[in-house]
Amino acid sequence: MIAIKKALYMTVPLLTVITSCVQANDNASSGSFTIGLGGRYAPRYSGSDKQVWQVVPVLQGRNGAFFIDSQKGVGYDLQNTSGWYFEHTLGYDLGRKDKNASWRAGANNLKGMGDIDVSLNTALAVGWQALSWLSVEGKATLPLTDSQGVSYQASFTLIPVQTDQDTIAFQTAALFGDNRYLNTWYGVNPEQSRRSGYSRYSAPGGFYGIDNSLIWSHQFDAHWGTVLSADYTWLGEHANESPIVLRRNEAALTAAVTWTFWSESMACVLPGKVKIE
């Protein structure tokens, strides 16, 4: 499912780094707290042909290796001197309604499909910051409640512009999921088919899409900042062949204003991991 929460999940890891400007000092811990508010114009659900405006809260805190984030959840990350890093998070997924919803994915044309419940998950990511402006990462997200399957992504991030005031970042990710995951979000079982009128569809596991994000962050001073992002998602055949997918090419826009409370002087770096020997 690449809509609202899922698309935000692509954007927020970059937004987290850009807005909190985590210090990368081998001899000192880092910490900051950022709040903000924004808006997002995105598909009602992955594959929807209708868009919706949503309010996007921003809440991000960091103390050394540990962090909390309104989109990612809570977790920690570590990086060695070679640039390899590891991240572990405990997060959530808002699921999907079978009617129009203002704070989660859902649309009236899904009536009869039933709701996909809110669930807890854990995510494991391993990546390499090859250069100050280039990083690659592999990530797996596993459900802890309401078995909805496992999703994976392989991504790389480029940062062509990075100054004291402005950061521009581009991220592209290939998206994968197991059979259970794809059928949770794109499949139509016999009971759903009977209730909704959609034809049956059993989605095979594997590659199901590509997500691209372009993000511009501007810092007015030590506290006030803005973040603008544009996202484009293309759904592969495993998702696009589902009868509930009405549009395979999706776009989303996000804008947010942030306020950062600094606990110490920091400099913006990516990916913002705490280094270990």
Residue ranges and their predicted role:
Residues 62-64, 77-79, 127-129, 157-161, ...:
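Structural signature of outer-membrane beta-barrel channels/translocons
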Residues 1-30, 48, 262-277:
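Cleavable N-terminal export/targeting peptides
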Residues 41, 120, 150, 208-210, ...:
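Transmembrane beta-barrel architecture of outer-membrane proteins
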Residues 56-58, 156, 248-277:
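Outer-membrane beta-barrel "beta-signal"
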Residues 25-76:
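Short glycine/proline- and aromatic-enriched beta-strand/turn motifs that initiate or cap beta-hairpins
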Residues 31-37, 57, 66-68, 86-88, ...:
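Transmembrane beta-strands of outer-membrane beta-barrel proteins
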Residues 28, 70-171, 179-204, 239, ...:
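Outer-membrane pore/translocation modules
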